[in-house]
Amino acid sequence: MRSSCVLLTALVALAAYYVYIPLPGSVSDPWKLMLLDATFRGAQQVSNLIHYLGLSHHLLALNFIIVSFGKKSAWSSAQVKVTDTDFDGVEVRVFEGPPKPEEPLKRSVVYIHGGGWALASAKIRYYDELCTAMAEELNAVIVSIEYRLVPKVYFPEQIHDVVRATKYFLKPEVLQKYMVDPGRICISGDSAGGSLAAALGQQFTQDASLKNKLKLQALIYPVLQALDFNTPSYQQNVNTPILPRYVMVKYWVDYFKGNYDFVQAMIVNNHTSLDVEEAAALRARLNWTSLLPASFTKNYKPVVQTTGNARIVQELPQLLDARSAPLIADQAVLQLLPKTYILTCEHDVLRDDGIMYAKRLETAGVEVTLDHFEDGFHGCMIFTSRPTNFSVGIRTRNSYIKWLDQNL
């Protein structure tokens, strides 16, 4: 009996040691976030072991775990009709809100899920619940795109998928089928999905047949650049769940089918050092010392290497492509974008990407709403139902839907 108690105590202590990580006091529901982070770290470690044993790619294994525990079939309710179909060969899940006699045509949001271009699905519970809520509360048609993921495809195929599906949806006959008002359409996405949404928005401004087709864009803690991994938010949140800096840099390398040997050099900005001529012209477009308010720069210092590794940009020229990094787009492109909503979270390495993009858009003459949550963390908006419900998740979702309701 005594030995059992000792063993149990030891196991509890080990579990507590694994789960506990120091978190800022201002983050929402810290103990719940620790448990969520421990669960995700555990799944990552299992998938890394599977990869090491040569059984499967670690991202395929990790996504199998995520989707297996969270996949939801297309289930319709009295309020929202849900169907799985495809738009020009790209899988989508469509959510149709309840009809209103006084409004025969509905507004619509094309939504792109996050997951580092490699994980999650439009068909998992978190995104299904988000899109269902949007369809019901906005009385809208929500098109959630199931784009192909790394490692099955790499940049720019994810962008091609979302552009192809959205172009198909914008056809007059398709909009008529779903009873959508062609003047009330928004493109939106979170995290990597926010990156894809921003890239799509920019691409549409450069296509005469698609210009002015989108009324709004709404970007939720978007990934917008890979040239500076030492912005104040990257420095402040270097180990903050659920997206530590090291993990984000690896997602970028995976997106470009790059070499993991580059990760450590990229973390210290060796890929954009002063001797890397290819990056020189783009530095001003993400100069956070001028783009961020003093309340965010605090006492952080820029990390600019004099000499670095030019080979990284030479082997991964995608780093300098505005389709992967919308923050570095030309001002002439930005000024053509529609009214924009950007949601950022204090405890997120990507915080400054969103804030800098908001500033560049404002400078270009675009109307921007920057919605910042002091207790938010990366990914929080999809965590709104038990057991992974967070106070800030509910508040961010409500704020996002409220903005759509008022502007779409």
From Swiss-Prot:
Assigned EC number: 3.1.1.-, 3.1.1.71
Gene3D superfamilies: alpha/beta hydrolase
Lumenal topological domain: 26-408
Pfam families xrefs: Abhydrolase_3
Keywords for this protein: Cell membrane, Endoplasmic reticulum, Glycoprotein, Hydrolase, Lipid degradation, Lipid metabolism, Membrane, Microsome, Signal-anchor, Transmembrane, Transmembrane helix
Predominant location category: membrane
Catalytic activity annotation: a 1-O-alkyl-2-acetyl-sn-glycerol + H2O = a 1-O-alkyl-sn-glycerol + acetate + H(+); 1-O-hexadecyl-2-acetyl-sn-glycerol + H2O = 1-O-hexadecyl-sn-glycerol + acetate + H(+); a cholesterol ester + H2O = cholesterol + a fatty acid + H(+); cholesteryl (9Z-octadecenoate) + H2O = cholesterol + (9Z)-octadecenoate + H(+)
Short sequence motif named Involved in the stabilization of the negatively charged intermediate by the formation of the oxyanion hole, residue ranges: 113-115
Residue ranges, Cytoplasmic side: 1-4
Modification after translation, per record: N-glycosylated.
Subcellular location: Cell membrane; Microsome
EC main group: hydrolase
Protein name from the UniProt record: Neutral cholesterol ester hydrolase 1
Organism encoding this protein: Pongo abelii
Gene for this chain: NCEH1
